Amino acid sequence: MSLRGGLPKFIFQRSMKMAVITIVGAGMMGSALAFPARENGNEVRIVGTHLDREIIEGCLANNRHPKFDRDFPEGISFYQIEDLEKGLDGVDMVIGGVSSFGVDWFGDNVLPVIPENVPVLTVTKGLMDTEDGKLLTYPDLWKKKLDSMGKKLSLNAVGGPCTSYELVAHDQTQVAFCGDDLETLKYLKKLMETDYYHVSITTDVVGIESAVALKNGYALGVALTIGVNQKNFGDDTLHFNSQAGLFGQALKEMYRLLEFQGAATLDNLGVGIGDLYVTVYGGRTRLVGILLGKGLNIDEAKAELQGVTLESLVVAERVARAIRINIEKGTLKAEDFPVLLHIDDIICKKAPVDIPWDAFTFVK
């Protein structure tokens, strides 16, 4: 068995090529999906966005993403954005690997050039709020854009508790693919599922996309308690009561938000809570939450983490804005969302951390 970078060369789980999969966006999650995709015997291409130029140059030189500690499986091709057309030639599946900051760019520059018979799977997590207090999924936004062009695509998404570096490490991972057509989802699952990447499939797009987006503010909330305890007791003493107390309240509020979205099923809640857990303990949102809990305001925390993408803050702000509109309408009650509203005050009004513990109690 040959060695590369100190690691065994992969023996593919399927001996014959199955499909051509092109990943557009060389961010960490999109790039991590190249591992199960290639290990299943597919031809895999990664096309960087205009912001990924240095990443692609590094991949071409070293066959490794600069944020990963492991080489890509052999046989992956890398392209700069100018070669997008070449990267899409003969493609069977496209994976959208942009962050929520790239939603408009992806809709304007990538979706229009994908052949209509090619399904798309996106890793982009988030929701967009409207002036009347609705929360829309990114696939819904992209569909509206495509409709205005007279084009149709099969738009699917992946959600669930999965960090990119742990996927690269082949930690056992449970995710859900969602889309409008179950047969298409079965096809995508066949291309991507491995003995460590386990895929559920569902046509409840609103449910999965909402569950994995709604967790953002709550992951920040749990991380606040970590920072507060580090400030009060030092970094060496672990405290879990406060984390667990806020986590439990987060579960309640996420369930109410899923009800608001018409998607309060046990499966959707499980995907969202799992994603909340991994984000608290392995995500970038944890870092900003700890800094806020230690006493920094939001601007100071952002400055401390300069260069770290914090899309979770934007998504949390959008969700809170929609909820406040519905509270004003009388559709929702403020007392049902003490964590979300406090997080919104911290992000938007630079309010100091003052977790409303008494608001979490109940009498039955």
What are these regions (language model features)?
Residues 5-17:
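Short, Lys/Arg-enriched N-terminal segments with co-localized hydrophobic residues
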Residues 18-20, 119, 343:
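Residues that mark the start of a beta-strand
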Residues 72, 215, 222-230, 237, ...:
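NAD(P)-dependent Rossmann-like dehydrogenase/reductase catalytic/cofactor-binding core
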Residues 113, 147-154, 172-266:
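Internal alpha-helical scaffold of NAD(P)-dependent oxidoreductase catalytic cores
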Residues 74, 78-172, 188:
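Rossmann-like NAD(P)(H) cofactor-binding subdomain of soluble oxidoreductases
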Residues 16-71, 76-83, 109, 130:
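NAD(P)+-binding Rossmann beta1-loop-alpha1 motif at the extreme N-terminus of oxidoreductases
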